[in-house]
Regions:
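Short, glycine-/small-residue-rich phosphate/pyrophosphate-handling segment
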Residues: 123-168
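Cofactor-binding loop segments of dinucleotide-utilizing enzymes, especially the Rossmann-like FAD-
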Residues: 10, 142, 179
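N-terminal beta1-alpha1-beta2 submodule of the flavodoxin-like/Rossmannoid cofactor-binding fold
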Residues: 2-96, 101-105, 109-112, 116, ...
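Short, well-ordered alpha-helix to beta-strand connector turns
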Residues: 89-90, 134, 171
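Short, structured loop/turn "capping" segments at alpha-beta junctions
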Residues: 117-121, 172-173
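Short histidine/acidic/glycine/proline-rich micro-motifs that form metal-
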Residues: 12-14, 145-146, 183-184
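Glycine-rich phosphate/pyrophosphate-binding loop and the adjoining helix
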Residues: 3, 149-206
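Hydrophobic/aromatic beta-strand patches that form the interior of the parallel beta-sheet core
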Residues: 6, 40-42, 138-140, 175-177
């Protein structure tokens, strides 16, 4: 059975992005270790998804009839496509820039499209239950400063947020590759990237 990998990038820095470099290295490593890996790529910065509108959300919840609203119908169709792409993937690799203590808004727009009650989680008698337990998610994060420890640690809202999101969706096979301090000089950046790539080299096959 062919394994499907969804590769997402969210940094707006293009070729200057460390997280893009790391996510590409992850996909390359997994492809080398996994025969016939089927990779789909989506650049959330170059081709950003629209943020959820009130009408789209209302229509999705059954509170608004969008049958005569072409714009909302198109937005719903796009959301369905993004959701299906996620649901049919076995592995998801995400490159994440760290902006103002959190994730890029482009990535948040994607998360809003895949966090769908009845599809990726459900509400039961005991509360919410994730429905995506069979997936593996690998997140590559680049941070300009040091947020894993020290006085800035309480300001880290990217890795912690994504752990919360994917755990909520039922995903327990969740890995983070982090390069931090990349804006603290060339020596610090080189050491951070090398450490991250050393970790990537040890990743198991898809």
């Amino acid at each position: 059975m062919t394994m499907k990998l969804l590769h997402l990038d969210s940094s707006v820095l293009g070729p200057y992005s460390v997280s893009r470099d790391l996510s590409a290295s992850i996909v390359k490593t997994l492809s080398e270790k996994t025969a016939g890996l089927d990779v789909t790529y989506r650049d959330l910065a170059a081709n950003p998804l629209p943020h959820l509108s009130g009408l789209t959300l209302a229509a999705a919840m059954g509170n608004y009839d969008a049958s005569n609203d072409d714009a909302t119908k198109a937005d719903l169709a796009l959301g369905g496509e993004v959701l299906e792409q996620f649901l049919t993937s076995d592995v998801v690799v995400i490159g994440v820039g760290f902006y103002n203590f959190g994730i890029p808004s482009q990535l948040k727009a994607w998360i809003d499209r895949i966090s769908v009650a009845g599809k990726t989680f459900k509400y039961g008698a005991a509360g919410p239950e994730g429905l995506c337990g069979g997936k593996r998610v690998i997140v590559a994060i680049s941070r300009g400063g040091i947020y894993s420890q020290g006085p800035a640690a309480p300001l880290e809202h990217a890795e912690t947020y994504l752990k919360g999101v994917f755990t909520f969706l039922g995903i327990t096979d969740l890995e983070f590759v982090v390069a931090e301090g990349v804006n603290m000089g060339e020596e610090a950046k080189a050491a951070a990237v090398k450490g991250a790539k050393d970790s990537i080299a040890t990743l198991k096959a898809a």
